[in-house]
C-alpha cells in the first residue's frame, strides 16, 4: 500500500499533536570539594537553609552554609566515595523523620530507619526535625509529677510533666543510670519514653537496650542512636529527630519523657561541623550559636494546654493537655560546671541534678549533691505526701554537711549536735538506692516517714539499708491496702499519718535493729 504526500503530511501532523513533552526542571549543582564530611557545591540555586541535597548513591547532605557562589553542606553518612565534579540535586525538602506509635519498642538511627533487625516500621507519617517550639499562649504551667522512682530525686528535686531537668556530672558517675531508672519507672504510668544516645559506644547502647528489655520498659520506649562511629551530622541531628518523635505524643494530648544522653557530645559534633564549614570559633572553639543549638531543642519540651491539643488534632482530642519532659545530660570535666556548654544548659533548663564524684566514690549512690541540685518548677507538681514528708530531708542533709566538717575539729560535741549528726548520717544512708529498683510513691513515703518521725534514731547506721528493705517487704505484705491507697491518691492526712505510725511501731516490735 502506497501513501501519497497528503496522507503522509496528515500522519505527521497527528503524531506531532499527540507528542507530549514532559519538561522537568532540576536544581542541579556540582561538588567542588569534599573535606571530612563537608562538601562545597557550585551552581546550586534556590537552596533553603537546612534543605536536603540528593547525592549519588541514595544519600543526602544538609545545606548549612549558603554563600553567594557556593553551598556548604554536611553529608549524612559515608562520604569516602564522593568526588569533585559529581552532580547533586536540590530536593526542596527539609529533613523529616517518621513518627508514630509504631516506633515504640524499636531502635532507630537519626533518620528513623530501624537498626534492630526487627523489620520495617509502620509510621503515622513524617515530621520535620526542626520545629518551632510552642508559644507562651499555648503552654500550661507544670502541675503533674513525673515519678522517677528514685527517692532522693522525688523527695528533694521533684520533676514535673513538661519540665526540663538537667543531669550533670563527671563521666562514669551514674548520670545515665538515673535517666534509665526514670524511663523504667514509666512503664505503667502511660508516659512514653524516648532515649537518644549521642556519640556513645555501640556496646554501651546495646547494654541500655538490653536493660530496658529485661525490665519490661522497651515496649514503651523509642531508642534513637547516633553512635560514636557515625558521621558528626547524624550526632548533631539525633536530639532533634528524637524530639520530633516525642512531640507526636505531646501534640495529641499524651505525655512523653525524652532523655538526651548526652548533649556535650552533640555540642562537640556541632563544633566539628562548624569549624569545617569555616565558621568563626568562639569560647572553647565552639561557634557563636552553640547556645541556640541547645535552647531551640530544649524549648520544645513543654506542657501544652487543651486548646493547643484540640487545634492540632482538628477537634479529635478535647480537654486533654500534652507534655514532653526532657532530661538532658551534660558531662563535666573534673566537676567544672562553669565551662561554656554546662553554664549554657543550666541557664536554659528548669533545674539541675548535680552528681558528685566524691559522693559516688564514697558509696553514696545515686551521688546526688542535694545542696546545689534544684528543681525550679517541680515543687508545684510534687505528690502531696512526698512534699509533706520530704521537706525535712534536704534540711537534715544540709545541716549534716555543715556539722560534719565542724565535727572533724571538735571532739566534745553536745547531745543536740551529736543527735543532728547521727540523724544526718542515717538520712544519707536512707537516700542510697540500687540501680533498676525504682520505688513506688508509697514505698518512698514510708521511707521518708520513718526518717521524719524518728523511727531510724535507734537503728544502727550500717543497718539502715537493711531496715528499709525489711520495712518495704513488711508494708507490702501486711499493709497492702494502706500502700494501695497512698499510691492511688498520694494524699497525706491525719488518718494516713496515724496508720503509718501504727504500722511502723508494729514493724519495729517484730525485731530489734
From Swiss-Prot:
**One GO CC term, this protein:** proton-transporting ATP synthase complex
Enzyme Commission designation: 7.1.2.2
Q: What is its main location?
A: membrane
Disulphide-bridged cysteine pairs: none
Query: What Gene Ontology molecular function terms does this protein carry?
Result: ADP binding; ATP binding; proton-transporting ATP synthase activity, rotational mechanism
Tell me where on the tree of life, at the top rank, the source sits: Bacteria
Q: Which UniProt keywords apply?
A: ATP synthesis, ATP-binding, Cell inner membrane, Cell membrane, CF(1), Hydrogen ion transport, Ion transport, Membrane, Nucleotide-binding, Translocase, Transport
The way this protein sits in the membrane is described as:
Peripheral membrane protein
Instruction: Fetch the Gene3D superfamilies from UniProt.
Output: 2.40.30.20, ATP synthase alpha/beta chain, C-terminal domain, P-loop containing nucleotide triphosphate hydrolases
Question: Which annotated residues bind ATP?
Answer: 169-176
Task: Show the catalytic activity.
Answer: ATP + H2O + 4 H(+)(in) = ADP + phosphate + 5 H(+)(out)
Family membership, please give it: Belongs to the ATPase alpha/beta chains family.
Q: How does it assemble?
A: F-type ATPases have 2 components, CF(1) - the catalytic core - and CF(0) - the membrane proton channel. CF(1) has five subunits: alpha(3), beta(3), gamma(1), delta(1), epsilon(1). CF(0) has three main subunits: a(1), b(2) and c(9-12). The alpha and beta chains form an alternating ring which encloses part of the gamma chain. CF(1) is attached to CF(0) by a central stalk formed by the gamma and epsilon chains, while a peripheral stalk is formed by the delta and b chains.
NCBIfam families per the record? Answer: atpA (TIGR00962), PRK13343.1 (NF009884)
The name this protein carries in UniProt is ATP synthase subunit alpha
Q: Which organism is it from?
A: Colwellia psychrerythraea (strain 34H / ATCC BAA-681)
Amino acid at each position: 500500500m502506497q501513501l501519497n504526500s497528503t496522507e503522509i503530511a496528515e500522519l505527521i501532523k497527528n503524531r506531532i499533536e499527540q507528542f507530549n513533552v514532559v519538561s522537568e526542571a532540576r536544581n542541579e549543582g556540582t561538588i567542588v570539594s569534599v573535606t571530612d564530611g563537608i562538601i562545597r557545591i557550585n551552581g546550586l540555586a534556590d537552596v533553603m537553609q537546612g534543605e536536603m541535597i540528593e547525592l549519588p548513591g541514595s544519600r543526602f547532605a544538609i545545606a548549612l552554609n549558603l554563600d553567594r557562589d557556593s553551598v556548604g553542606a554536611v553529608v549524612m553518612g559515608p562520604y569516602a566515595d564522593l568526588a569533585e565534579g559529581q552532580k547533586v540535586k536540590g530536593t526542596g525538602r527539609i529533613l523529616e523523620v517518621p513518627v508514630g506509635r509504631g516506633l515504640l519498642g524499636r531502635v532507630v538511627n537519626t533518620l528513623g530507619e530501624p537498626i534492630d533487625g526487627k523489620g520495617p516500621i509502620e509510621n503515622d507519617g513524617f515530621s520535620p526535625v526542626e520545629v518551632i517550639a510552642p508559644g507562651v499562649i499555648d503552654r500550661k504551667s507544670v502541675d503533674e509529677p513525673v515519678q522517677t522512682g528514685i527517692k532522693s530525686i522525688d523527695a528533694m528535686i521533684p520533676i514535673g510533666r513538661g519540665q526540663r531537668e538537667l543531669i550533670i556530672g563527671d563521666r562514669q558517675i551514674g548520670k545515665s543510670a538515673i535517666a534509665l531508672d526514670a524511663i523504667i519507672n514509666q512503664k505503667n504510668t502511660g508516659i512514653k519514653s524516648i532515649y537518644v544516645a549521642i556519640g556513645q559506644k555501640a556496646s554501651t547502647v546495646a547494654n541500655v537496650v538490653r536493660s530496658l528489655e529485661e525490665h519490661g520498659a522497651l515496649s514503651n520506649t523509642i531508642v534513637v542512636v547516633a553512635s560514636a562511629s557515625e558521621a558528626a551530622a547524624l550526632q548533631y541531628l539525633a536530639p532533634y529527630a528524637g524530639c520530633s518523635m516525642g512531640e507526636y505524643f505531646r501534640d495529641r494530648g499524651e505525655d512523653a519523657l525524652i532523655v538526651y544522653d548526652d548533649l556535650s557530645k552533640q555540642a562537640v559534633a556541632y563544633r566539628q561541623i562548624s569549624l569545617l564549614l569555616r565558621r568563626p570559633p568562639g569560647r572553647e572553639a565552639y561557634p557563636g550559636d552553640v547556645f541556640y543549638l541547645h535552647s531551640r531543642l530544649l524549648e520544645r519540651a513543654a506542657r501544652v494546654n487543651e486548646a493547643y491539643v484540640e487545634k492540632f488534632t482538628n477537634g479529635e482530642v478535647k480537654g486533654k493537655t500534652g507534655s514532653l519532659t526532657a532530661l538532658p545530660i551534660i558531662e563535666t570535666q573534673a566537676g567544672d560546671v562553669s565551662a561554656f556548654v554546662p553554664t549554657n544548659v543550666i541557664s536554659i533548663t528548669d533545674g539541675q541534678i548535680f552528681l558528685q564524684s566524691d559522693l559516688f566514690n564514697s558509696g553514696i549512690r545515686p551521688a546526688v549533691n542535694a545542696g546545689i541540685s534544684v528543681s525550679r518548677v517541680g515543687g508545684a507538681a510534687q505528690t502531696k505526701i512526698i512534699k509533706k514528708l520530704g521537706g525535712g530531708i534536704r534540711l537534715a542533709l544540709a545541716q549534716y554537711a555543715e556539722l560534719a566538717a565542724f565535727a572533724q575539729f571538735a571532739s566534745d560535741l553536745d547531745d543536740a549536735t551529736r543527735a543532728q549528726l547521727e540523724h544526718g548520717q542515717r538520712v544519707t544512708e536512707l537516700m542510697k538506692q540500687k540501680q533498676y529498683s525504682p520505688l513506688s510513691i508509697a514505698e518512698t513515703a514510708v521511707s521518708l516517714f520513718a526518717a521524719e518521725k524518728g523511727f531510724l534514731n535507734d537503728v544502727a547506721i550500717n543497718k539502715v539499708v537493711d531496715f528499709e528493705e525489711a520495712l518495704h517487704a513488711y508494708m507490702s505484705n501486711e499493709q497492702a491496702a494502706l500502700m494501695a491507697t497512698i499510691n492511688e491518691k498520694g494524699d497525706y492526712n491525719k488518718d494516713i499519718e496515724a496508720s503509718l505510725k501504727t504500722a511502723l511501731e508494729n514493724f519495729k516490735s517484730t525485731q530489734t535493729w
